[in-house]
Amino acid sequence: MDNKLTDFKIGLTALGAFLSSLLGILYVPVLLMVACNVIDYITGLVAAHYRGEKVSSYIGLRGIIKKVCLWLLVVVGAIMDTLIKYAADTVGIKPPVHFLIACIVAVWIICNELISILENMIDIGVKIPPFLLPLVKLLKEQTEKAGEPKEEG
């Protein structure tokens, strides 16, 4: 049994190292995003039960497809980052950070997921600290502002 646990830990560490080397700065946001996706999906199912709503495999599949589409938004951000880096490299500019747009997209998605998780918890009957939901909403707003063009003046 101890051998299997050790093998599992080694495999998990190797997977983490591989993903970290592949994603770089995106590793932590993507990991958090996927964790939030799973938690939101589970709390959403439980909250639907508490609200007396019928949950079907079709509704569940739609939720999963939505989560996968959210992952694709990060891919779109990464593609934009890669294009910008390629264009900058072409003219001799070295951007200090790669995957900036993708990181902002991932943080925005994480904020949306956290809002949904907290709302699901409220529907389940969990008492949450009164400052938590407004704080997450503020972080989401700040993330949205980070992606907006700055006005010169």
Question: Model regions: which residues?
Answer:
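N-terminal intrinsically disordered, cationic/polar leader segments
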Residues: A35-A47, G92
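Short, strongly hydrophobic alpha-helical membrane anchors
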Residues: M1-L22
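Hydrophobic alpha-helical transmembrane segments and immediately flanking/interface helices
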Residues: K85-L114
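Juxtamembrane helix-capping/reentrant segments at transmembrane boundaries
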Residues: R51-V74
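Membrane-proximal cytosolic segments adjacent to transmembrane helices
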Residues: M1-F8, K94, C111-G153
